[in-house]
């Protein structure tokens, strides 16, 4: 079973969204853009237990907390605002096809659309497939002062006109939707509370049959007082004092200690899963295990459930990278991609992002204050899948999540420009720090690759800034750079090292070389004479050779850290200043009114 369309209205931070998927979906984007809200919306619609809690929704599940629309005419009642979550499901299991037969519609595979009423008779296997549309509607009921939500079949031919049939919980269980929240699932995943992963697993395995009756019977037979004789006089004294106020007709012992309240609900909360991971360790409650181990245990449960229902399980997982080491992140991603029908994953981790193809990666962004849009990364032209996978962990994934990217052609610039930016920001409070503004730096490894990556980032909606060496280029080549770069900086030097040698004062270059010698660097290896030359030209030539031979060491960045304000290379400084104009500091409106503080 797969979700191919998802529509969301007035739910949490999303006023409206219409998203299309084709299989697995990695959801990436900035914080608070709506990644988790998509997973929560899927849970509200497909999760079998979400709507059974009371209340199923609350005030802040509505967009901006608005669950009532003010009356347009004075004296009239306000109108309830509705939450709507709609999904179109394909690849339905045989059991769903059978039990939901009258609600089925047809989906055109190639054109990715729902067949209209007149086209259904012409539906052909291989061209169209059965599909199921569901909708969850939530609203506030002023009469009862309650929040309600219910899931319906959108195609309800047997319902009264204007109404829709309700989707029962036993049908929702057939969908096999499982939601692993990054920070919330672990605390109850291995408990027996309703809807927990262990509870779902026991239900699927039919292990719960007779569990509670047998457990309650055994607990009733447990004589706690017999193992603690010192309790006897205490309980007797309590009974004697109780009889002075409340006459008791029961003969013999009137008080009893049990380990729980002997109800199913209380046992669900008190029963605990214990775990031992080492030979020298006794079993402890699962919450006491390491966080990484706990999350891995949760994955183990999820995989168990997926294998029990291989044709229907849909996973939604938030940020698997939280407290989980890189190799486990990769294993989680690989498992979801190969063993589940469909997985929705939110992540900022390059170890997760690199496992998904561009066709399965969606960059979320706000088109307006509350409208959410998703761009498939594969639609960002100019980058082959091999390049995408190769560079994903080298900064590509970080840049995709930002607002702008500085693209350079080598590691010297990659290390040096961030240092120069921090120096400028430290001296001028009017500058918005580039990292906070969402500007990353990306090493394209050669100038010829800059247009390719710039085109990719530009298609994702990022501002692109290129900084590269001068080179003989014809008009066609120059046009490629200009077309995809918001700031197209081809500086006049043949290398960044030459720029530093030409624009940083010789006194600073000499001091830097002397500092290297004093630090104990292998002077012979880097061909630095133990006594520095007095000729300025020789110092400049030496600095170019030294910096060129140590690109990975970041010595250019170290030189810039030592420069005073007046000593920094003007060409690079002016380039960064152009970028700052794209990202000014946010305007902070001072507080007004009675709460405002005056000096």
Task: Show the residue positions of the predicted features.
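Conserved beta-strand position immediately N-terminal to the Walker
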Residues: 24-27, 178, 405
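Extended helical coiled-coil dimerization/tether regions that scaffold
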Residues: 189-192, 199-297, 301-313, 476
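Acidic, Mg2+-coordinating catalytic modules of nucleic-acid enzymes
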Residues: 394-407, 411-599
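Short glycine-/polar-rich loops that comprise or flank the Walker A/P-loop
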Residues: 81-85, 130-134, 173-177, 312, ...
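Electropositive, glycine-dotted interaction segments
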Residues: 92-211
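Conserved catalytic network of the ASCE P-loop NTPase/AAA+ motor domain
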Residues: 19-20, 30, 75-80, 125-129, ...
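Switch/communication elements of ASCE P-loop NTPase nucleotide-binding domains
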Residues: 1-47, 273-398, 570, 581-599
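Conserved P-loop NTP-binding catalytic core
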Residues: 40-128
């Amino acid at each position: 079973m797969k979700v191919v369309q998802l529509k969301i209205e007035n739910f949490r931070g999303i006023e409206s969204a219409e998203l299309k998927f084709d299989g697995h979906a990695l959801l990436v984007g900035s914080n608070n853009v709506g990644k988790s809200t998509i997973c929560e919306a899927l849970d509200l619609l497909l999760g079998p237990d979400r709507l059974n809690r009371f209340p199923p929704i609350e005030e802040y599940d509505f967009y901006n907390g608005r669950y009532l629309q003010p009356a347009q005419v004075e004296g009239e009642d306000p109108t309830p605002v509705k939450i709507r979550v709609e999904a179109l499901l394909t690849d339905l299991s045989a059991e769903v096809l059978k039990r939901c037969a009258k609600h089925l519609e047809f989906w055109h595979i190639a054109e990715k659309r729902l067949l209209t009423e007149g086209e259904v008779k012409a539906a052909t296997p291989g061209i169209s497939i059965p599909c199921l549309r569901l909708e969850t509607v939530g609203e506030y009921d002023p009469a009862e002062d309650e929040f309600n939500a219910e899931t319906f079949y959108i195609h309800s031919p047997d319902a009264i006109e204007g109404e829709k049939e309700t989707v029962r919980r036993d049908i929702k269980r057939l969908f096999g939707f499982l939601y692993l929240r990054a920070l919330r699932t672990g605390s109850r995943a291995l408990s027996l509370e309703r809807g927990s992963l262990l509870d779902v697993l026991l239900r699927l395995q039919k292990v719960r049959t007779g569990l509670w009756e047998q457990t309650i019977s055994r607990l009733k037979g447990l004589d706690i007082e017999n193992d603690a004789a010192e309790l006897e006089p205490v309980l007797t004294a309590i009974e004697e004092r109780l009889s002075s106020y409340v006459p008791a007709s029961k003969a013999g012992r009137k008080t009893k200690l049990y380990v729980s309240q002997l109800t199913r609900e209380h046992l669900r909360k008190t029963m605990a899963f214990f775990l031992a991971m080492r030979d020298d360790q006794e079993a402890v409650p699962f919450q006491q295990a390491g966080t990484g181990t706990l999350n891995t245990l949760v994955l183990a449960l999820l995989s168990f459930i997926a294998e029990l229902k291989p044709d229907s399980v849909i996973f939604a997982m938030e940020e698997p990278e939280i407290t989980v080491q890189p190799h486990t992140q990769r294993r989680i991603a690989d498992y979801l991609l190969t063993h589940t029908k469909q997985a929705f994953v939110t992540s900022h981790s390059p170890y997760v992002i690199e496992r998904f193809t561009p066709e399965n990666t969606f960059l979320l962004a706000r088109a307006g204050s509350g409208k959410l849009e998703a761009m498939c990364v594969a639609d960002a032209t100019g980058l082959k899948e091999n390049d995408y996978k190769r560079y994903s962990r080298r900064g590509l994934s970080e840049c995709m999540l930002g607002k702008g990217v500085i693209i350079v052609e080598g590691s010297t610039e990659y290390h040096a420009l961030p240092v120069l930016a921090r120096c400028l920001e430290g001296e001028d409070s009017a500058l918005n720090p580039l990292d906070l503004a969402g500007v990353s730096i990306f090493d394209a490894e050669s100038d010829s690759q800059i247009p390719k990556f710039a085109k990719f980032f530009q298609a994702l909606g990022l501002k692109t800034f290129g900084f590269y060496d001068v080179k003989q280029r014809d008009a066609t080549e120059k046009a490629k750079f200009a077309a995809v770069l918001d700031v197209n900086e081809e500086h006049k030097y043949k290398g960044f090292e030459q720029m530093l040698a030409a624009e940083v004062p010789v006194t600073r270059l000499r001091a830097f070389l002397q500092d290297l010698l004093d630090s104990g660097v292998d002077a012979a290896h880097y061909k630095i004479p133990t006594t520095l030359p007095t000729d300025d030209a020789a110092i400049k030539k030496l600095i170019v050779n030294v910096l060129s031979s140590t690109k990975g060491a970041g010595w250019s960045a170290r030189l810039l850290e030592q420069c005073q304000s007046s000593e920094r290379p003007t060409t690079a400084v002016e380039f960064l200043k152009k970028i700052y104009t794209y990202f000014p500091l946010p305007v902070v409106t001072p507080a007004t009114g009675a709460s405002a503080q005056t000096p």
